[in-house]
């Protein structure tokens, strides 16, 4: 069947840059990759992109906890994510980050267009504020009972049980995830996207066939309950992009995250030196196709906010959203205690990528159903299908071809009608890949594999090989078996990239969709090497145990200075500039009568003397040893009246306290009065 080449842009949901990739993530990336590889086999121009979702308070707080900058943390996380995806042979054309200049420019562009078109509204809101941490609480840092379905322990922006979205202030009995404190209300000016203005457009888009039936039905419920304006701003401190002309206000992560699809593609176009393609794919009247593979937990954002943002800023909308369900393991939610919360990297330490790719693919359909990774069934299915049915078909015929015929296949097919049965299946299997009915495609392929093995069993080449004057029959039978193996591997090529590479090396030819119409006749194959190894439950047991150990290690208390004394909240440069640090010479140091903690220091600031009380006595039992040293002091600190006198500043020291206090000293050459910058 001849197809017209299409231009296709495919994305996966952006993994959040504060944690490792696990097997739940991998379902989506494998599903998308199989579909993309099939599209490429059919000759379409496919751009497959992704990025890390790298903004938000969770990243800011975790970086503080680790004692590193958010930029450093997301950089390290990006490398880990890309390594995991490469390990599973996810064939991205580009993997980027939402914390990029491309994404900043596009976010500001879309925001400015929405504002110019009247879709951004300003209003003062009452917002939850953590009195202990001194910060406004993002949606995901408030938990409570869902106001719609009354499910407990739900986040402040949407319910994972009923899918409803709401304001954090609507939560019943909210608690701060950061400190556990009960939040208080404070006013703050915020910016809102006028989503209700797009209700008519969204309802028409919903009915256009751009969504799975289950998603379209869910959207109808949201329309019936009424669309609300969407808060797209967050208050400092926040790690993200500051909103233009709005100091201290930042784009909410869910505004710039989907724009990250555009940012990653723009980055790819720039790398290629291809400035035309970006507009060709994203302009309002684009004929290119745009598909988002996402999980059912983020349907609301992708089916309402995202197309409305694109419409309001004069960009094209997605051709379709491909939504999948969750992953369970052994019939239950992934569990850290049971060792079934398995990271992608842990999996690759015990199994190859093709095995999981195959198992997920065999269970996937176009519906939004959850997928269960039953580890015992996984072992049985991989061995039964990949090893016993497919690889065994090659191994049981290749030996005779290599030993008896120097690797050369017969010049004619032994059973042309059987071969035609295999190639005629291309249309049904191709349609199944196209429509994401992956399980159906696998069932069709395995039915053919059974047919191929039945042919070999009936022809019994091992018997023919012992009979005189039947070399031609032996060559024909085994060549037929190898040709059928070639067709099967062509159909499985989108699923099993590494096994395909080994099969192509053995067959001495590239596997292409259209190529199967011509069998390999008189063709020389290479010596056969083992294509795939059986797996067993011992590997599963080791995998589960390794996952448990990783959880124990991660749960171990973090020790060290930063864990004991975390970094304080982020301040602005202007805040820091108010602190006047100066080099000071310690002219005198003495005990303070009546205090077992303080030393009285007389400091020379280069023309001005200061009297400072400092709680460093336990670390410096001989104060005379400090005389003549240079140190750093806060020179513009308001004088503080103490019962021992007036303290006119503060000297700088490091350490946990007690005897472990270390007075800071400038490098040689610094003089009293020099400002520390």
UniProtKB/Swiss-Prot annotation:
Top class in the EC scheme: ligase
Chain ranges for the short sequence motif 'KMSKS' region as given in the UniProt record: 333-337
Chief place of localization: cytoplasm
Protein EC: 6.1.1.10
Binding site residues for Zn(2+): 146, 149, 159, 162
GO molecular function, one term: metal ion binding
Cell compartment(s), UniProt: Cytoplasm
Residues holding ATP: 336
Residues of the tRNA-binding domain: 575-677
Keywords: Aminoacyl-tRNA synthetase, ATP-binding, Cytoplasm, Ligase, Metal-binding, Nucleotide-binding, Protein biosynthesis, RNA-binding, tRNA-binding, Zinc
Any single GO BP term: methionyl-tRNA aminoacylation
Short sequence motif 'HIGH' region: positions: 15-25
Pfam family, one: Anticodon_3
InterPro entries for this protein: aa-tRNA-synth_I_CS, Anticodon_Met, Met-tRNA-synth_bsu_C, Met-tRNA_ligase_1, Met-tRNA_synth, Methionyl/Leucyl_tRNA_Synth, MetRS_core, MetRS_Zn
Domain of life: Bacteria
Reaction it catalyzes: tRNA(Met) + L-methionine + ATP = L-methionyl-tRNA(Met) + AMP + diphosphate
Cofactor: how bound: Binds 1 zinc ion per subunit.
Gene Ontology CC: one annotated term: cytosol
PANTHER family found in the cross-reference section: METHIONINE--TRNA LIGASE (PTHR45765), METHIONINE--TRNA LIGASE, CYTOPLASMIC (PTHR45765:SF1)
Subunit structure: Homodimer.
Function noted in UniProt: Is required not only for elongation of protein synthesis but also for the initiation of all mRNA translation through initiator tRNA(fMet) aminoacylation.
Family, per entry: Belongs to the class-I aminoacyl-tRNA synthetase family. MetG type 1 subfamily.
NCBIfam families per the UniProt record, alphabetical: metG, metG_C_term, PRK00133.1
Protein's recorded name: Methionine--tRNA ligase
Species this chain originates from: Shigella boydii serotype 4 (strain Sb227)
């Amino acid at each position: 069947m001849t197809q017209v080449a299409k231009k296709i842009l495919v994305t996966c949901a952006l993994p959040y840059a504060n944690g490792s990739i696990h097997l739940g993530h991998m379902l989506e990336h494998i599903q998308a990759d199989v579909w993309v590889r099939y599209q490429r086999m059919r000759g379409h121009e496919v751009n497959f992109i992704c990025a890390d979702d790298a903004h938000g308070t969770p990243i800011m707080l975790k970086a503080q906890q680790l004692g590193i900058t958010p930029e450093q943390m997301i950089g390290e996380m990006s490398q880990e994510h890309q390594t995991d995806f490469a390990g599973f042979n996810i064939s991205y054309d580009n993997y980027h980050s939402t914390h990029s200049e491309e994404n900043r420019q596009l976010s500001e562009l879309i925001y400015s267009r929405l504002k110019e078109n009247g879709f951004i509204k300003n209003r003062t809101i009452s917002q939850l504020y953590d009195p202990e941490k001194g910060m406004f609480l993002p949606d995901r840092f408030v938990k409570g009972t869902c106001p719609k379905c009354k499910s407990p322990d739900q986040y402040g922006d949407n319910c994972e049980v009923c899918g409803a979205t709401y304001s954090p202030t609507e939560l019943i009995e909210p608690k701060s995830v950061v400190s556990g404190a009960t939040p208080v209300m404070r006013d703050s000016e915020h910016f809102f996207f006028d989503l209700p203005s797009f209700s008519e457009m969204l309802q028409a888009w919903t009915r256009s066939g751009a969504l799975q039936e289950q998603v379209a039905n869910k959207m109808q419920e949201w329309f019936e309950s009424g669309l609300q304006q969407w808060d797209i701003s967050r208050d400092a401190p926040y790690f993200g992009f500051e909103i233009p002309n709005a100091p201290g206000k930042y784009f909410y992560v869910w505004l710039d995250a989907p724009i990250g699809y555009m940012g990653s593609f723009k980055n790819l176009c720039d790398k290629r030196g291809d400035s035309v393609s970006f507009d060709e794919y994203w302009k309002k009247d684009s004929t290119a196709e745009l598909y988002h593979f996402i999980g059912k937990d983020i349907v609301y954002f992708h089916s309402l906010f995202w197309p409305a943002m694109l419409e309001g800023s004069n960009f094209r909308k997605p051709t379709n959203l491909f939504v999948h369900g969750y992953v369970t393991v052994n019939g239950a939610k992934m569990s850290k205690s049971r060792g079934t919360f398995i990271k992608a990297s842990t999996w690759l330490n015990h199994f190859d990528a093709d095995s999981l790719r195959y198992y997920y693919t065999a269970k996937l359909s176009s519906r939004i159903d959850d997928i269960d990774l039953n580890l015992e069934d996984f072992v049985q299915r991989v061995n039964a299908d990949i090893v016993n049915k497919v690889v065994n078909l090659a191994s049981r015929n290749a030996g005779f071809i290599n030993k008896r015929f120097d690797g050369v296949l017969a010049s004619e097919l032994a059973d042309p009608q059987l071969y035609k049965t295999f190639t005629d299946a291309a249309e049904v299997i191709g349609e199944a890949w196209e429509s994401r009915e992956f399980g159906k495609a696998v069932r069709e392929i395995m039915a053919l594999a059974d047919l191929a093995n039945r042919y070999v069993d009936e022809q019994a080449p091992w018997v023919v090989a012992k009979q005189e004057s039947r070399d031609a029959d032996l060559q024909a039978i085994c060549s037929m078996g190898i040709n059928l193996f070639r067709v099967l591997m062509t159909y499985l090529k989108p699923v099993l990239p590494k096994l395909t590479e080994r099969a192509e090396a053995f067959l001495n030819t590239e596997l292409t969709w259209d190529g199967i119409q011509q069998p390999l006749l008189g063709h020389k194959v290479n010596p056969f090497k083992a294509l795939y190894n059986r797996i067993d439950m011992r590997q599963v047991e080791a995998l589960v145990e390794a996952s448990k150990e990783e959880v124990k290690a991660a749960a171990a208390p973090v020790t060290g200075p930063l864990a004991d004394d975390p970094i304080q909240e982020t301040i602005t440069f202007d805040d820091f500039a108010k602190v006047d640090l100066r080099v000071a010479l310690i002219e005198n140091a003495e005990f303070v009568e009546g205090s077992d903690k303080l030393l009285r220091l007389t400091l020379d600031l280069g023309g001005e003397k200061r009297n400072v009380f400092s709680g460093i006595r336990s670390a410096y039992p001989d104060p005379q040893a400090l005389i003549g040293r240079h140190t750093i002091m806060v020179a513009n600190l308001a004088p503080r009246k103490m019962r021992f006198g007036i303290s006119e500043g503060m000297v700088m020291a490091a350490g946990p306290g007690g005897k472990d206090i270390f007075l800071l000293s400038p490098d040689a050459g610094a003089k009293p009065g020099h400002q520390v910058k």
